[in-house]
Amino acid sequence: MDCGPPATLQPHLAGPPGTARRPVAVCQQESLSFVELPPSRLCVDLFPIAPEELQAPGSRWSLATPAPLQGLLWPTSPGGPDTHIASTSGGMRPGRAGSWPHCPGAQPPTLVEPWSSQHMQPQRRASHSGSEKSAWRKMQVYHNEEATGTETPTGLLETGQAAQEQALCALEPGPQELSGNARGGLEAPERRRFSASELMTRLHSSLRLGRSTATRVLTSGSGAGAIREGKLPVRESRRAETRADSVSLPGPVDLNEVHGGLVEPRLDTQDKPTQDPSSATERRQSRFLLNSVLYQEYSDVASARELRRQQREEEGPGDGAEGAEEGPGPPRANLSPSSSFRAQRSTRGSTFSLWQDIPDVRGSGVLATLSLRDCKLQEAKFELITSEASYIHSLSVAVGHFLGSVELSECLGTQDKQWLFSKLPEVKSTSERFLHDLEQRLEADVLRFSVCDVVLHHCPAFRRVYLPYVTNQAYQERTYQRLLLENPKFPGILARLEESPVCQRLPLTSFLILPFQRVTRLKMLVENILKRTAPGSQDEDMATKAFSALKELVQECNASVQSMKRTEELIHLSKKIHFEGKIFPLISQARWLVRHGELVELAPLPAAPPAKLKLSSKAVYLHLFNDCLLLSRRKELGKFAVFVHANMAELQVRDLSLKLQGIPGHVFLLRLLHGQRARHQLLLRARTESEKQRWISALRPSSPQEDKEITCDGEDRPQVQCVRTYKALQPDELTLEKTDILAVKTRTSDGWLEGVRLADGEKGWVPQAHVVEISSLSARLRNLREYKRVSNASSKLGDPPA
């Protein structure tokens, strides 16, 4: 049935030249208010039709309702065509400007039968109470549009009408949901509301049917040709997919799942008996992923928050005092987003940055009953989920924007591409499954959810993808540097990709190191959860198991990276070091380089009189390994000739702190023993104080028990916290991340210190410019308590202390 205007009216309906066609009705509100429209003539500017054609009974522009259209564009009243729905009293609710086409001096066109006198007054539906109105604003009704296929337009509209009427009946509230003073006479107005909504939907549907019919006629030839060539019309297929995804009629909406006006996906609807778990994870849309920030930004914000926590301790005792976390939670004002790190994030941040910001949590009243420790425990769990979403966001950018770049793929060879990106897609898939399980756990019980068992369950999968990726880090770095130097197209293509707002102008290297950063951060997040669990509880046991599994994974990753670097370094040195005497087997899996460098050997001149000491200086090069020391002289072409070597047990070092008479510089004495006697004795001079202390510390290493005493028993021992990341340049240095806390062991006057990291017990040298002193005694004591808390929990499982 042709419902459109005659062909002669098409130029008039198209509007003046140069103007775009606009839809008949547009609404962007969450809730609509439909008002009865007074009778009037059709706007002659919009419909230039002869008056006799409007009065003709059979004309398509007659004001009377055509019989074929009754019940199609709007349902027929049960009492016949003249039956009207009674309206309630009340003033007119102003509509939105531009909702209907209008012209000066004319009312909106009449779309229904001739009006009776009772419709002359403005009418509206009755108002609901605040709760019902808020609930109805969160519900949206969609109409099933299936305008493709071989069905006739009439059949399609009848099918859509039946499906929509069923959905509307299911969504219509019962009388018990309305307030008592508005129950009487509200059944008909509510039916009136949905009739108006149904009217607008079907008007849009009829317009789309006309356009889709014309489109099918115009594109039938080209579409058939594309199919014969084995190609699908991409534009039409995407349009069909969009309609199929956005127009399907939803079932009854559970208002308990609505957060902030958005309907959240339910996990139970994703579980089907014949559904593959991986496909369910891919089809399920994360509630945090779409609006999450990049992981690089999250790391900066989280580090700044931890630094502010230490600064608050500097200003005065806070919640770190003993027993402070057992009291009631902070006041409501302190739980607002403005006092959290969400105020520091960008506008593209995640929907809820804090667990306490979730509407279900705020509305439950549980915040008033939880202690400060319990609040921090839930926030630590929630941060693990939101940070994982941020991590996947960055991985998606790395895989989609960089790895998926056609231009970059054409520039790189297959082997270079494999070495540069390694197993990054597999890491992303594993993290997506992990986030899927975490969100299911959160949605199951948002008030008392747990995550450590989920972490423990995924640790084997983490090991399968993280260990190969981190092990490949050395090849990855070398491949990146080689491509910059040898591939002329690579720097330009990479620069264009890095300038894109998709990656927020961050370099590719910041994305490639994310897996190693994440596995370390994941251990830290689980450690924060463990610190706040009740001692002896089941939660503590599960958190300890998850922490131990992640700690073991991090240790394996570090050992794998160090093993490759150490082996390559030994192979490189074996080609340069030559022994004058017997052959020394340098390459060994149990050996690694600790420190190397050149010092000045001082020796008295034989002809010098004893009263006037004169010293000769000679350069000597030291290669210190974990089990032996090699002393050599430099030769041509960068080679070394070893003249003496000794085991670590045969070394004795002494710091000559007081300057010897006539011997300037930073001097220390090195003895190579043979039994109880000194086989060789060398007076060595370093260039700086820190160089001398670093050599003394390396030649006389402390035992693990001594390092443990520094971290556990030294309540008055100084502590520092990293404020700037530092990458170790020498084997005896320590790589630092922001917020790392060190117990200071040795300081030098030229700006270096040796410390032991509380988190893992690693020891090394770092520049003082990258750390700040923790002067607050309460903050230092709290750091030691947290360290002992984790160590005691780990010892219950038989693991070595963290």
UniProtKB/Swiss-Prot annotation:
Region feature Disordered, mapped onto this chain: 1-21, 77-136, 173-192, 218-286, 307-343
Tissue: Highly expressed in intestine, and at lower levels in liver, heart and kidney.
Top-rank taxon: Eukaryota
Compositional bias ranges of the Basic and acidic residues kind: 228-244, 265-274
Record domain SH3: where: 715-776
Domain PH intervals: 592-704
Molecular function terms from GO: GTPase activator activity; guanyl-nucleotide exchange factor activity
UniProt KW keywords: GTPase activation, Guanine-nucleotide releasing factor, SH3 domain
Domain DH: 376-560
Record-level GO BP terms: regulation of actin cytoskeleton organization; wound healing
Family matches, as CDD domains: PH_ephexin, RhoGEF
Pfam families: PH, RhoGEF, SH3_2
Biological role: Acts as a guanine nucleotide exchange factor (GEF) for RhoA GTPase.
Protein name (Swiss-Prot/TrEMBL): Rho guanine nucleotide exchange factor 19
Taxonomic path: Eukaryota, Metazoa, Chordata, Craniata, Vertebrata
